[in-house]
């Protein structure tokens, strides 16, 4: 399924790869915390069986006359024996992408908030036994700090077993094709799109700031995996390289989006275009963005 909305004058398509269930207990075993969770989390974000939806999804932005893809998911047939949710997927992602009316060759820029397998996999696709760029006319914009973290050719490289092979299959072919732009922590892709640092989940993790005509939005990658981490930004579920930085980043994003009435669009939330953060009686509330209602296409 592909969904479309308009945010701040920019046309945005969401392209879903896959939705998978995860027990809430994998995020926290604190029973007191769970019992005190606000009602607005149920059932949209936590179901009756205490399961949460984790969505792998990308966005296509039409802004400033350019076509920009954000976080191109995992890819099919990738061997990740140490990370079952990404292992040997077989999804109609490219068909859903095509349903938007945007062709891979129409894409001007690809941006990955970080270089975990589920955020850069469709950078490439397998053709005649080798990985080649999926978006042949695009510039693949990657933050230099994040690129260095995963460059397996470096003598100081520290591997992470679940992410093994991602650099070689999803990043290096783009480098070899001459399509990569390695940029500083803060960088403008277009007049309305700026990369900003959001470290913690990975050391070079970034977010993409859409400065729309009437509203702003932040594509924040894995700064948050679930709204529970907005309510409890100090909750450590063990997925961050530097949790101290991750907690600081979460608090900064929350403050920024509250102050600016900006949408926050996390990579894995079960809402296609993120939502707004509000304060209700002093408590933080995340309201999914449903205005205007998103239109849907099925591949």
Language-model segments: residues:
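Metallo-beta-lactamase
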Residues: 1-102, 106-118, 134-197, 214-221, 245-261
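Active-site metal-binding loops of divalent metal-dependent hydrolases
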Residues: 17-18, 72-75, 115, 145-146, ...
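Short, P/G- and charge-enriched loop/turn segments at secondary-structure junctions
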Residues: 44-49, 128-129, 195
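Cap/insert and terminal regions of metallo-dependent hydrolase folds
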Residues: 84-91, 95, 213-299
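Metal-dependent catalytic neighborhoods of phosphoester/phosphodiester hydrolases
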Residues: 120-130, 276-277
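Active-site glycine- and acidic-residue-rich loops that bind
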Residues: 120-122, 194-206
């Amino acid at each position: 399924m592909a969904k479309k909305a308009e945010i701040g004058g920019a046309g945005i398509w969401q392209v879903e790869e896959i939705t998978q269930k995860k027990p809430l207990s994998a995020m926290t075993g604190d029973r007191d915390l769970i019992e005190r969770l606000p009602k607005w989390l149920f059932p949209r974000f936590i179901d009756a069986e205490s399961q949460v939806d984790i969505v792998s999804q990308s966005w296509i932005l039409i802004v400033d006359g350019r076509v920009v893809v954000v976080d191109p998911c995992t890819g099919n047939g990738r061997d990740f024996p140490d990370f079952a949710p990404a292992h040997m997927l077989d999804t109609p992602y490219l068909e859903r992408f095509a349903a938007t009316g945007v062709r891979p060759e129409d894409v001007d820029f690809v941006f990955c908030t970080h270089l975990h397998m589920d955020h850069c996999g469709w950078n490439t696709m397998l053709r005649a036994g080798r990985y080649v760029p999926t978006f042949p006319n695009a510039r693949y914009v990657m933050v230099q700090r994040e690129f260095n973290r995963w460059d397996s050719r470096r003598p100081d490289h520290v591997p992470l077993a679940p992410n093994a092979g991602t650099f070689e299959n999803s990043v290096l072919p783009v480098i070899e094709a001459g399509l990569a732009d390695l940029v500083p922590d803060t960088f403008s892709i277009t007049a309305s799109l700026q990369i900003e640092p959001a470290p913690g989940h990975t050391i070079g993790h970034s977010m993409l700031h859409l400065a729309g005509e009437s509203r702003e939005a932040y594509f924040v990658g894995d700064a948050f995996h679930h709204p529970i981490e907005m309510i409890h930004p100090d909750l450590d579920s063990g997925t961050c390289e530097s949790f101290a930085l991750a907690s600081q980043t979460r608090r900064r994003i929350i403050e920024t989006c509250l102050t600016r009435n900006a949408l926050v669009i996390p990579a894995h939330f079960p809402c296609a275009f993120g939502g707004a953060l509000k304060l209700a009686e002093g408590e933080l509330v995340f309201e999914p963005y449903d205005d205007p209602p998103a239109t849907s296409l099925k591949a």
